[in-house]
Amino acid sequence: MADYIVKDISLADFGRKEIAIAETEMPGLMATRAEYGPQQILKGARIAGSLHMTIQTAVLIETLTALGAEVRWASCNIFSTQDHAAAAIAAAGVPVFAFKGENLVEYWEYAHKIFEWHDGGYPNLILDDGGDATLLCVLGPKAEKDPSILNNPQNEEEEALYAVMKKYLAEKPGFYSAIRAAIGGVSEETTTGVHRLYQMAQKDELPFPAINVNDSVTKSKFDNLYGCRESLVDAIRRGTDVMLSGKVAVVCGYGDVGKGSAASLRQGGARVIVTEVDPICALQAAMEGYEVQTLNDVADKADIFVTATGNKDVITVDDMRKMKNNAIVCNIGHFDSEIQIAGLRNFKWDEIKPQVHHVEFPDGKKLIVLSEGRLVNLGNATGHPSFVMSASFTNQTLAQIELWTNKAKYENQVYTLPKHLDEKVAFLHLEKLGAKLTTLRKDQADYIGVPEAGPFKPDHYRY
């Protein structure tokens, strides 16, 4: 029996062609293969991957295997898989469990499959995006001790998760404790997952060391900012074919993702309004020329609404009842909790095409909801471009190498990659853009108190 679940394995050739193109746009990963591949630095590593199964992720997976690792993979979002990418990786012999449009039970079943190795063994590393794989290693052992904690799901997502976990508790006693004991560390990709890790660490519940990849400068200041700047408008246009020029758009949240989203909409010709709870971010938005208002003040005036906060219930049903007919509502944060989708389920839904729905209120007014409130840039489009993902995924690869080769160095806490690796990731991407670095003279380096070859900034420097 094939050790993969994909939509259509015959898409593998198509996927392989796009992977080949992506490789030319991902210099960091290709340089990492060239540097570490000959020594097979990850030989013996078994990596359970939970991250959007895209063409760019395929290049990451094949970088990990080129470095000697064994890998099993699932997507971290029910809509984000690119089926030709999953097929290409499965055809190459890597077990992949992902297709676009999974239901929630399938999603959590596949999240479990990445821990079930072909020989009955377990993985020893996790590469996570959003923290769901790590969650199983924390919640699972608790449920083994007290199954009653799975009896009261608070939402549709927990209902599916708890159902799958109950099945594993019955069929594989001790499974969760075994995987927790086997894992030597996790590298986490995104803001939401990092937030979960810090919460676990504060409660002394983090079962293994964690590297926060998200807060590498070459991740958060590039992927989150420049990636969203390109992919948000791409998703809205693919989903709706709407003309952005002249429209009023609201971006909820002005962190790195919000900054990229606001820039994306502005470049598309929209007039952008920002909502914020943080006075520093609000001032940044105002100084960039954006209006800063409350959602309550603009709900009935805007044409497009985008959430980018990482919080819950940012746009409520009451907010949506105030919106214009055919206003577009979407989310570019990791989870689907930012828009009150559960409350919208009480109204009439009509699928226009995959990941595009009309939701009709009793008064006849309709909204256009994209990707059911999940990540719009991966649900309605193909996510960030390859080049910016190369920086993020080079950080992920270096984090996996660090966890594998320096296990004794880390305790069960959350760490970031050192500055010299951040600078290395940036350096690997300069040549592709034709950028040339100026070299410090020794007297200049001495004058500002840094090594001639870097690191050039202290850890607390804000880029």
UniProtKB/Swiss-Prot annotation:
Arranged from A to Z, the UniProt key words for this protein are:
Cytoplasm, Hydrolase, NAD, One-carbon metabolism
Q: What class of enzyme is it?
A: hydrolase
Q: How is the cofactor bound?
A: Binds 1 NAD(+) per subunit.
**Binding residues annotated for NAD(+), in chain numbering:** 190-192, 224, 253-258, 276, 311, 332-334, 377
Spell out the coiled coil positions from the record.
none
Q: Which cofactor does it need?
A: NAD(+)
Which reactions appear under catalytic activity for this entry?
Answer: S-adenosyl-L-homocysteine + H2O = L-homocysteine + adenosine
Q: What Enzyme Commission number(s) appear in the record?
A: 3.13.2.1
Tell me the SUPFAM superfamilies matching this sequence.
Answer: Formate/glycerate dehydrogenase catalytic domain-like (SSF52283), NAD(P)-binding Rossmann-fold domains (SSF51735)
> Which biological pathway?
Amino-acid biosynthesis; L-homocysteine biosynthesis; L-homocysteine from S-adenosyl-L-homocysteine: step 1/1
Which Pfam families does the entry link to?
AdoHcyase, AdoHcyase_NAD
Q: Which domain of life is it from?
A: Bacteria
Q: Which residues bind substrate?
A: T54, D129, E189, K219, D223
- Cross-referenced Gene3D superfamilies: Adenosylhomocysteinase-like, NAD(P)-binding Rossmann-like Domain
Family according to the record: Belongs to the adenosylhomocysteinase family.
Function per UniProt: May play a key role in the regulation of the intracellular concentration of adenosylhomocysteine.
Q: Which HAMAP family match?
A: AdoHcyase
This protein is called: Adenosylhomocysteinase
| Species of origin | Caulobacter vibrioides (strain ATCC 19089 / CIP 103742 / CB 15)
